[in-house]
């Protein structure tokens, strides 16, 4: 890993980072290929399997680059970064037996992420937000195509408004998960949730309370949309894997630091 930070002014910095690492596929799925005989006493005897010595686990080399800028003011704090990562191989899932293979197709993920917080002068109000917009692609036959939605991540954005008159701290935030599609025509549907988070400082300790999914949005989680693509119809109807997100959820907590 290597990085450099330049102080443009007292309140502004820019940076560049480079890192190189190795991503390993799931060993259980990579080596989980075998032939089994007839059941004996309720167990299936393993007849043959992948020889680990003859099939070493292939590492995927990942190079990552990031260029960013930040500003820290009295009332405004913001930062912006662009990133780009490349991989020399790609993981592919066999949806018949759920094993995986490592292919020589290259992969790249790139995007822009940022955040901003603004504290309104002479008031207890503040606003802010953050976002991460990205694309994930694999190179197939010399052409870059969208990566499989069962592996790629969707773009996200969050916006919030806060009010913090001492000893209260209240915040309402909205998170948007955007649609995602791949080269095979599969699609994940985005959704929006709103949360309310608050706290009250007591003479001894602090009470924290929350209402997640304040508007009781009916949605299917990202995993709940990926799972049917992975497991259905081989392992049953898609309805078995459509995991819904939690509805309106209340939380209450008391904490004491000593």
Per-region residue spans from a language model:
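Solvent-exposed loop segments that connect transmembrane elements
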Residues: 28-55, 92-100, 138-146, 221-242
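C-terminal beta-signal and adjacent terminal beta-strands/loops
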Residues: 22, 179-181, 199-258
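Outer-membrane beta-barrel proteins
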Residues: 11-13, 23-29, 34, 78, ...
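Short sequence motifs at beta-strands and strand-loop junctions characteristic
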Residues: 56-61, 104-108, 149-154, 188-191, ...
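Hydrophobic, lipid-facing positions within transmembrane beta-strands of outer-membrane proteins
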Residues: 1-4, 53, 63-67, 78, ...
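Membrane-embedded beta-barrel scaffold of Gram-negative outer-membrane proteins
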Residues: 7, 13-15, 41-43, 49, ...
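Gram-negative outer-membrane beta-barrel transporters
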Residues: 75-88, 102-184, 253-257
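Structural signature of outer-membrane beta-barrel channels/translocons
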Residues: 5-7, 60, 70-74, 85, ...
């Amino acid at each position: 890993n290597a990085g450099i930070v330049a102080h443009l002014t007292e309140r502004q910095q820019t940076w560049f980072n480079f890192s190189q690492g190795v991503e390993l596929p799931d060993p259980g799925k990579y080596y989980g290929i075998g032939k089994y005989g007839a059941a004996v006493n309720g167990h299936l005897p393993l007849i043959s399997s992948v020889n680990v010595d003859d099939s070493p686990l292939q590492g995927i080399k990942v190079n990552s680059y990031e260029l960013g800028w930040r500003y820290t003011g009295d009332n405004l704090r913001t930062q912006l970064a662009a990133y780009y990562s490349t991989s020399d191989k790609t993981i592919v899932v066999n949806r018949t037996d759920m094993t995986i293979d490592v292919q020589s197709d290259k992969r790249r993920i790139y995007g822009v992420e940022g955040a901003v917080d603004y504290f309104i002068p002479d008031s207890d109000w503040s606003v802010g937000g953050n976002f991460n917009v990205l694309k994930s692609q694999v190179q197939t036959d010399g052409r870059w195509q969208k990566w499989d939605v069962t592996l790629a991540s969707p773009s996200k954005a969050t916006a919030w408004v806060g009010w913090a008159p001492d000893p209260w701290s209240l915040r309402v935030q909205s998170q948007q998960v955007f649609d995602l599609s791949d080269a095979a025509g599969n699609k994940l549907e985005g959704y929006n949730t709103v949360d309310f988070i608050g706290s009250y400082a007591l003479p001894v300790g602090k009470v924290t309370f929350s209402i997640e999914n304040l508007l009781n949005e009916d949605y299917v989680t990202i995993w709940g949309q990926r799972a049917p693509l992975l497991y259905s119809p081989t392992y049953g109807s898609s309805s078995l894997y459509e995991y819904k997100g939690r509805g309106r959820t209340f939380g209450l907590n008391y904490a004491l630091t000593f």
